[in-house]
Amino acid sequence: MAYTELNIELTDEQRAIKEETHRFSKEVLRPASIELDKLDRPDDVIKSPLFWDTMKKGYDLGYHTVFIPDTWGGLGLEPLEVHLVLEELGWGSADFAIALGVACFPAFFASMVPNEILAEKIIEPFCEDKDASIIGCWGITEPDHGTDTLCPGTPEFRDPNINGQVTARLDGDEWVIEGQKSAWVSNGTIATHSLVYLSIDPSMGMAGGGICIVPLDQPGVRKGKPLDKLGQRALNQGEIFFDGARIPRDYMLVEPESYEALMDITLATANAGMGAVFTGVARAAYEEALNYAKNQRVQGGKYLFEHQAIKHKLFNMFMKIEAARALSRAAVIYNMNNTPPMTEYSIAAKVFCTNTAFEVANDAVQIFGGYGVSREYPVEKFFRDARASLIEDGANDSLMITGAHAL
């Protein structure tokens, strides 16, 4: 059962966008992610023709440019349409929804501070790509820094004793990059370009950072092995090492004077997007459980749904999903339309929606009983994917502390 769209102001075009994305997710993303999830080694995932065929199909439809304006060749979606697309992609596969979303980060941030070189070398080639030959990654976490990098506006962000492990120094007309990004870099070992967050002025603490684009096919760049993890196993993640990598001066998008403001935009964009994606994951788990209870499983001589305890559980799941959609949609729409963003709402959306996805998936497993932990049904994958979401893009407990600073 698909949810009922309560926004009666959706245009026919917006409904068509939603339906087309849902069809792609149902026919391509979900089957592929389930098959790739069964592979034992993460190396096997990125060597699989199925993985690359799925990425290419996503690129061919432009889902790698969801956040990029049409003036640069992106899909040019309105904020509401972005939410519709992200939820449907998440319904199909959190793995691929995140991979396609993160792939655009270098080009997306370049489009916010464009120049002729960035347009020619980064933005336009990425938007024109139809075969996933240009893939971005988000190089923000480090071996000693995770969610603590995502705290703009807090006293800790300006503590000179806390600094990033990746650094940049200017050498003539080039920046020289040194250091290591952690194993949690999404798309890390398959990316061609990285959006790198680094330290330029350590006396300012984390606030003395910069954001740059680093082509990864150059001397001085080395990638680690793909990370083997519990959930979202089709989402490639891995370390990146910089040892004297060089970039043109124009590839440094943000320097310390505007770093904190851009970090705020980063957090608002990523967290709101995660809220939309995991609303989709929650919905996927709920729909599987509802169908199983109403049409498949008989217990005590009647379908599971006829038992009051199951009705109560399913309606509780339904309520949570509707609330998650409302919050994440509001955060996406407001923060894509306004600068500076209200980041606390994006944080609230990320925390609430990922918690909802985990709780709903957990309830779905319980409704399925023994089959809930069997790979015969997809709810166990939704459960594992949702569990990972409580940590990625900022651990929920820590994000709530960051969000509280704005209250």
Q: Whereabouts are the PLM-identified features?
A:
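N-terminal glycine-rich flavin-associated loop
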Residues: 97-119, 149
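Alpha-helical interface subdomain recognition
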Residues: 1-92, 116-117, 129, 170-175, ...
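Long, acidic (Asp/Glu-rich), low-complexity accessory segments flanking structured domains
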Residues: 243-261
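Short Gly/Pro-enriched turn/cap motifs at secondary-structure boundaries
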Residues: 155-159, 184-186, 203, 229-236
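A gly/ser-rich beta-alpha-beta helix-loop segment of oxidoreductase catalytic cores
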Residues: 134-169
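Flexible, small-/acidic-enriched active-site or ligand-binding loops
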Residues: 217-246
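A short core secondary-structure module
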Residues: 178-222
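Short secondary-structure capping/junction motifs at helix and strand boundaries
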Residues: 94-99, 116-124, 131-137
